[in-house]
Amino acid sequence: MSAQQFYGDKGYAPAPPQQAYGGPNYYPPQQNYPQQGYAPPQGYPQGGYPAQQPMYVQQPQASDPGGDLCCGLLTGLACCCCLDAMF
């Protein structure tokens, strides 16, 4: 089906393709840029940035292993009491 058959004689026609402003040579040639890819900044090895080591932080050990359980139970109980008081 051609555009003439699709649109008929109603005066509707597809818009002509728009040309870029200024034609194909609109953008000026780039200057003062290296042509050969990316150079790493000075002070780093040629391979790029040094690999970072993961940091491990040791958590302090609780002296009473049951203390965390008690604290969790008390927190849950306090939360339930607060909800009961609100409703």
Swiss-Prot record:
Topology versus the membrane: Lipid-anchor
Keyword Membrane included in the entry's annotation: yes
Protein name: Lipid-anchored plasma membrane protein uvi15
Keywords associated with the record: Cell membrane, Lipoprotein, Membrane, Stress response
Gene Ontology CC terms, in alphabetical order: cell division site; cell tip; plasma membrane
Cellular location(s): Cell membrane; Cell tip
Keyword Ion transport: no
Functional note: Required for the maintenance of viability of cells in stationary phase and in starvation conditions.
Induction details: By UV light, alkylating agents and heat shock.
Family the UniProt entry places it in: Belongs to the CYSTM1 family.
Post-translational modification: Palmitoylated.
